[in-house]
């Protein structure tokens, strides 16, 4: 998707142009009675082209959809569209978030900024100011050999130890690559689970792995208690590259949330990064699942 197309879809999502009408007010206003016992969150990367320039406006819009929690991307690590937020301290960004009607409990950090002890110490201070519970590494464990993956897992365990001393929990976020790339027909992700110390590092599951043939709920049940959160995506049955409103795609969400309890999930973050216009519909679906 090119930048112009993405911005068009983002603008449509921000303006809720035509989309509000497809969900009756009675549905949108309903509380989450049946209870997924986790706050409804979203990943800020979805709105990367606007949230850096207009953080309050963007977050207030998402709060109006029913979202309660935002997972930030480290401005210093991600730069790019998040660069305008670098000027804020953790305390300042927390105030902006709270004043917009949201909480923040988790943030993504890049491999480069957390695998240097000096940089990590500064990031831990920022995270504590922001009020985080989880510091999630956005990737970096994949490698060409098993030995190199093990070495990187050892690095991640070291990060987890320092984050734990800082009063938080470290997490690791997968992408499809951890499943697509294999050693002896086993996904690299499985190998990572063997070498990551669960007492130091938990996992954040990217549901998009379903498009590579791997279901989050299978991992939740096979590895109970090892997951702290998940990024939620859903895809058209006829086109697995097309993001759709949750509940209209290929993911069995009732089974997902049943298994999430076993997996240990504390937070969920909707992340429809190629089509922000479906974010409101996803909020409505989750509140009424």
Residue ranges of each PLM-predicted region?
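Active-site acidic/histidine proton-transfer and metal-coordination neighborhood
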Residues: 10-16, 20, 96, 100-103, ...
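Glycine-rich, proline-tolerant flexible connector loops at the mouths of alpha/beta enzymes
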Residues: 71-92
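Active-site mouth loops of central-metabolism enzymes
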Residues: 41-53, 108-117
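Acidic (Asp/Glu)-rich catalytic clusters
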Residues: 32-35, 59-64, 85-104, 121-131, ...
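Active-site-proximal loop/turn and secondary-structure-junction residues that shape catalytic pockets
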Residues: 46-48, 74-76, 110-113, 141-143, ...
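Histidine-acidic metal/acid-base catalytic patches
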Residues: 4-41, 48, 53-68, 183-201, ...
């Amino acid at each position: 998707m090119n930048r112009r197309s993405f911005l068009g879809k983002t603008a449509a999502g921000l303006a809720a142009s035509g989309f509000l009408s497809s969900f009756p007010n009675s549905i949108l206003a309903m509380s989450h009675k049946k209870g997924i016992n986790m706050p409804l969150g979203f990943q800020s990367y979805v709105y990367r082209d606007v949230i850096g320039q207009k953080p309050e406006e963007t977050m207030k819009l998402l709060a109006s959809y029913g979202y309660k929690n935002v997972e930030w991307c480290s401005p210093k690590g991600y730069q790019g569209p998040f660069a305008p937020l670098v000027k804020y301290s953790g305390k300042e960004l927390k105030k902006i978030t709270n004043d917009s009607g949201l909480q923040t409990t988790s943030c993504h950090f890049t491999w480069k900024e957390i695998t240097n002890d000096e940089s990590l110490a500064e990031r831990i201070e920022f995270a504590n100011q922001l009020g985080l519970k989880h510091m999630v590494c956005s990737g970096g464990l994949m490698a060409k050999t098993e030995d190199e993956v093990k070495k990187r897992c050892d690095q991640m365990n070291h990060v987890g130890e320092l984050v734990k001393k800082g009063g938080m929990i470290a997490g690791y976020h997968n992408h499809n690559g951890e499943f697509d790339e294999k050693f002896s027909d086993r996904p690299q992700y499985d190998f990572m689970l063997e070498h990551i110390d669960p007492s130091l590092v938990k996992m954040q599951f990217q549901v998009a792995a379903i498009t590579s043939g791997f279901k989050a709920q299978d991992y939740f049940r096979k590895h109970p208690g090892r997951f702290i959160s998940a990024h939620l995506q859903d895809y058209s049955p006829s086109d697995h590259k097309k993001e759709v409103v949750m509940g209209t795609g290929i993911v069995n969400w009732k089974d997902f949330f049943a298994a999430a309890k076993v997996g240990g999930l504390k937070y969920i973050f909707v992340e429809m990064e190629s089509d922000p216009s479906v974010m409101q519909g996803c909020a409505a679906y989750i509140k009424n699942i």
